[in-house]
Amino acid sequence: MKLIVGLGNPGAKYRFTRHNAGFMVVDRLAGAAGTTVNRRRCFSLVGEGRLNGVRVVLAKPQTYMNLSGLAVSALCRHYRLELADLLVICDDLDLEFGRIRLRPKGGSGGHRGLASIIAALGSSDFPRVRIGIGKAEDASAHVLGEFAPEDQSGLEEILSTAALAAACACREGLDEAMSRFNSWRLMSANGTAEV
């Protein structure tokens, strides 16, 4: 079993913000897994299903970003999962818009949701999918703002590709997913992409 956690903030106010890119990817994975992410468990909304034959738990913590570790550690305990069975999906200021990056482990990179998870788990040795949202002078306003109108045309392709990358990591392993998706980039405003 794999636990795929998309990071974000709960509530309609934050639904379409850059910081909720992880939630958006989990919503796309839910359709592919034949589930809905709407049951309350371990400070999260969860749904269970199968993704390419692999049993998955999809989760969206409801603790707000800075306390994501509370939910993730509770989920790992509840489902009795090892860190290798966890995949966290989040936004990344240090990655340009139109890029995704998978990593087997690493620091928080200043992402407070990741920092909370690392602190709660006592380890940074868990895989993650990072979705580039680009930098801005006011980082807080940027992550809590909605995607710019000029980014909307490519956003669906980015989120769908991140979902494919997560599914590939579950089915074929993280190394294969990194090989296949870390070089992917959205090529133009009309959503044309390359892998």
UniProtKB/Swiss-Prot annotation:
Keywords: Cytoplasm, Hydrolase, RNA-binding, tRNA-binding. The gene is pth. The keyword Plastid does not apply. TRNA binds at Y14, Y64, N66. The keyword Cytoplasm applies. One of its GO terms (cellular component) is cytoplasm. GO terms for biological process: protein quality control for misfolded or incompletely synthesized proteins; rescue of stalled ribosome. Hydrolyzes ribosome-free peptidyl-tRNAs (with 1 or more amino acids incorporated), which drop off the ribosome during protein synthesis, or as a result of ribosome stalling. Catalyzes the release of premature peptidyl moieties from peptidyl-tRNA molecules trapped in stalled 50S ribosomal subunits, and thus maintains levels of free tRNAs and 50S ribosomes. It comes from Desulforudis audaxviator (strain MP104C). It catalyses: an N-acyl-L-alpha-aminoacyl-tRNA + H2O = an N-acyl-L-amino acid + a tRNA + H(+). Belongs to the PTH family. It holds the Pfam family Pept_tRNA_hydro. The active site is at H19. This is Peptidyl-tRNA hydrolase. Monomer. The record marks D91 as: Stabilizes the basic form of H active site to accept a proton. Disulfide bonds: none annotated. Its EC number is 3.1.1.29. It is an enzyme of class 3 (hydrolase). The record marks N9 as: Discriminates between blocked and unblocked aminoacyl-tRNA. It is found in: Cytoplasm. PROSITE patterns: PEPT_TRNA_HYDROL_1 (PS01195).
